[in-house]
Amino acid sequence: MRRRGGRIAALASAAILVVAGCSAPNRDGGSAGGNAEIGKSSDINPQDPASLKKGGNLRLAIGALPSNFNTLNIDGNEADNGSMQRPTMPRSFTIAPDGSMKVNTDYFTSVELTKTDPQVVTYTINPKATWSDGAPITWEDIASQINATSGKDKAFAIASPNGSDRVASVTRGVDDKQAVVTFAQHYPEWRGMFAGNTMLLPKSMTANPDVFNKGQLDKPGPSAGPFVVSSVDRTAQRVTLSRNPNWWGTPPLLDSITFLALDDAARIPALQNNTIDATGIASLDELKIAQGTEGISIRRAPGPSWYHL
C-alpha cells in the first residue's frame, strides 16, 4: 500500500493522529497527503480497498515493547500491546463505519444470544479458522480462556474477568466448532467477551497458570490472523508483522506492519524524518509542528473515550 504523497495527520475529538504515506520513499504531494489544514469533524479520507495498491510496509509507533505479550495477563494489558496484536488474533465482532457491531465472519459464522433465562450465547466457529501452529480453533479454546479469566483460580494473573466470572459452563455444541456458553448471572456486554483487545487465545496459552503468566514473555504464542508476528527485536525496540501464508480470509494489502517503540516526544520528529508513517498529536505545539511540516496531512475523526472509576 505505497501511497504517493506525504504524511497524514489525523485529529480526533480528544486526540490528533498524524499519518505519513505507508513507507512511501517520496513526499511529493498527492491526494492522500500534503494537506496540513484541520478538516471537518470527520475527514479520514476513506478509500475502497480495491482502489489501493498492494504491498508496502506500514510503520507505526508504540510506547514500549510489552513485558508480556499475553493481553489477558495483568502485565500485558496495555493498549499498545492490544493494538499491535489485533491483526494477528481472533475477535468475535468488528465495528462498522456507522458504529454498529458485526460478527467477524473470518472467525465465527455466527455469535448469537440463543436463550435469555438462563442467558446462553452460542459461538459457531468458521470451519477454516486455524491457529498458526496448525491446530484448529475449537470450542475448547473458548472454554479454556473463560476458565482462566474467571477468577476462580487466583494463580492466573488476569487483567479482568470481562464477564467470565458470570459464566456457569462452556460446553461443546453440535461439533468441535461450536461453543455453548451458559451464564449463571446475566451479562449485558456479552458481545465484548472476545472483542476489542480481549482477543481469543489458543488453549495452549490459557491451559494453566504457568503458561498463562509466563508463556508469552519473549514473544507471542500461536496466532490466527491475516498477519503473524515474524520478528521481535528488543535491541532495536521493534516488532514486525508479516502476512500469514495460511490465512483463509481476504488477503491483506500490506506486506508488513512494523511497530517501533518511541517516547512521545520522539514521535513527531520521527514522522518528519520519515521513520514512521503515523502518530498521534497530544498538544497544540505538536499540532503546529505538524501543520508547518511539508508533506504532512492532518486527519480528524470522533473518538470514543472512557474512564476507570
Model regions and ranges:
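Short, well-ordered beta-strand elements
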Residues: 55-64, 109, 119-123, 145-146, ...
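Gly/Pro-rich hinge or "lid" segments in bacterial periplasmic/extracellular proteins
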Residues: 195-249, 256
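N-terminal lobe/hinge region of extracytoplasmic solute-binding protein
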Residues: 58-116, 147, 222
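Bacterial lipoprotein signal-peptidase II cleavage site
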Residues: 22-33
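Ligand-binding "clamshell"
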Residues: 288-300
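Surface-exposed binding/hinge segments that line
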Residues: 53, 124, 159-207
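Ligand-site clamp/hinge motif
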Residues: 244-289
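Aromatic- and charge-enriched surface segment that lines or borders ligand/interaction sites
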Residues: 110-155
